[in-house]
Amino acid sequence: MVSALSFCDLKGSSDQGQAQHMEDEATVPIYERHAEALYQNVVEGSFQEPHFSGLEVQPPANPQNILSRYQFGRILGQGGFGTVYEGRRLEDGLEVAVKIARKPWNMPYIVIPGHPALLPLEVGLLILVNWDPKVPQIVQLLDWQDQPDYYIMVLERPSPCTDLSNYISLFRGTLHEFVARLVMWQVTHAANVCSARGVLHRDIKMENLLINPETLEIKLIDFGCGDLLKESAYNQFCGTEDYCPPEFRTEGRYHGNPATVWSLGVLLFRMVCGHFPEPIELLAIYTGIWNQSGLSHECCHLIQCLLQQDPSRRIGLEEILPHSWFQVLSLRSATNGLEEVFTF
C-alpha cells in the first residue's frame, strides 16, 4: 500500500512501468495528464507517474477538480496504488501533501455518520479519526475528492519532520529510553484515539510515524491498510510482516486491539533494543524472565506485557498509558520552551 502521507521514505510495493499512451502535454491540463498517466494501464498492471519538477507548476483553476487548487512539487513517495506529491495550496500557500491513489477492482467503500454517500475506505477512516476534538498525533485530512478511477487526499505536511526509522538511524538504531517513552506515549495515545473512534490502523510501524526532530512530536500517518474496528476477528492480515501478531500465524485470525498492542510492543522493543525481537527473546518474554541491560525495570515490564504470545494474556490497549512507565512524562518543546507534564 502507498503511504497516506510519507515525507521521507514512502514504503509500498512498486508497480512501475512505462506509460503506453499519454495526451499531448501542450494541450492537456497537468492534473488531467497526471490522472491519465497514473490510471491508463490499470488493467495491464503497469504505470509510471509523471514527475513534476518544482513548485512552479500551477494547474489551471477548475473548481470541479481538486487538483486545480494546488501547486505540485517533487514526488515524496510512490507505491503500488498511487503517489504522494509535495504540494502548496494556492489559496493561502499552505504546504501540504497530495496523495493520488488509483482504485483497485475491489475498492472498499464505507458509510459514516454525517456523510450519506459512500466513501473510499481510507478517506472514511481519516475522516473518522479527524473528528473533533482533533489530536496532533494523527495526521489531518484537509481535503479530498472521489473520482471514477482514483481518489485524491490532501493532508497536512508538518515541517521539519522525518520518519521515525530515519530518525533512529541517526542514533545507531537505538533510542534513549526517555526519548522512546516520549514517542511511545504519543503513538499509544494516537492508537487509543483511533480505537475510540472505531478505526483500526493495522500498520503502526516506524515508517508510518513522523517525528519532528526539534520537538519530538509524533504524527501517525498512512491509513491505507486500515479498516473499521469490529469486535469479531479478522481473518486477513494487512500490514507489515515484522509487526504481525503471532495469533494470525498460528490460527489465521486476530482481533483488532490485541493486534495493535502487539505492534506497539514490537515498536517499543525495536526502539530501545535496536532490533526486532528474536524467537528466543519472545520465549523469554513469554516466560517472564526477559531483561535488557540498560533499561529500567518498568520499561522491561511493559515490553513483557505488550509482547505476550497469547492475546488473552496481553495488556489491554487502554491499560498501556496507566502503566508505571508513564507515571510522569515531561514533553519539552524545543521551539517555545514550554513544558507539558502528563501524569497518569
Go through the PLM ranges and name each one.
Residues 158-168:
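Structural motif in protein kinase domains
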Residues 247-258:
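Conserved end of the kinase activation segment
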Residues 309-313, 317-333:
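Terminal C-lobe "cap" of eukaryotic-type protein kinase domains
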